[in-house]
Amino acid sequence: MTRVPRGYIARRRRTKMRSFASNFRGAHLRLNRMITQQVRRAFVSSHRDRGRQKRDFRRLWITRINAATRVYNVFNSYSKLIHNLSKKELILNRKMLAQVAVSNPNNLYTISNKIRTIN
């Protein structure tokens, strides 16, 4: 079998992988085999953590809303607040409620009063 010189194609593939590894250190930046392993591992981690990030932020928002409702005695708990919001068909997502709870807690009172007055 004849030998095929793969100079340009192999170099292009390696430089592409090297561009992904530009912020790595040591052998992870210099050795081609190590670069491919670490870049593949980094892609796996980033793919996994994109899904995890959504869960983590939702947990953070729920924690902030729960803390604010308990401190300011809005509905005594997060679950009662969310239940009454859905029962009265007020459309506020958890991200917006958490932002209101952190930045301006007085607006939580207005939201709770609005929930109580709607029949």
Curated annotation (Swiss-Prot):
Q: Name one GO molecular function term.
A: rRNA binding
What are the entry keywords?
A: Chloroplast, Plastid, Ribonucleoprotein, Ribosomal protein, RNA-binding, rRNA-binding
Its domain of life? Eukaryota
- Provide one Gene Ontology biological process annotation: translation
InterPro entries xrefs: Ribosomal_bL20 (IPR005813), RIBOSOMAL_L20_CS (IPR049946), Ribosomal_protein_bL20_C (IPR035566)
Tell me the Gene3D superfamilies matching this sequence: 6.10.160.10, Ribosomal protein L20
Its main localization is plastid
Compartment list: Plastid, Chloroplast
Q: Does the keyword DNA repair apply?
A: no
Its GO CC terms are: chloroplast; ribonucleoprotein complex; ribosome
Q: Which HAMAP family match?
A: Ribosomal_bL20
Q: What does this protein do?
A: Binds directly to 23S ribosomal RNA and is necessary for the in vitro assembly process of the 50S ribosomal subunit. It is not involved in the protein synthesizing functions of that subunit.
Q: Which NCBIfam families match?
A: rplT_bact
Q: To which protein family does this belong?
A: Belongs to the bacterial ribosomal protein bL20 family.
What is the protein name stated in its UniProt record? Large ribosomal subunit protein bL20c
Lineage in the entry?
Eukaryota, Viridiplantae, Streptophyta, Embryophyta, Tracheophyta
Q: Which gene encodes it?
A: rpl20
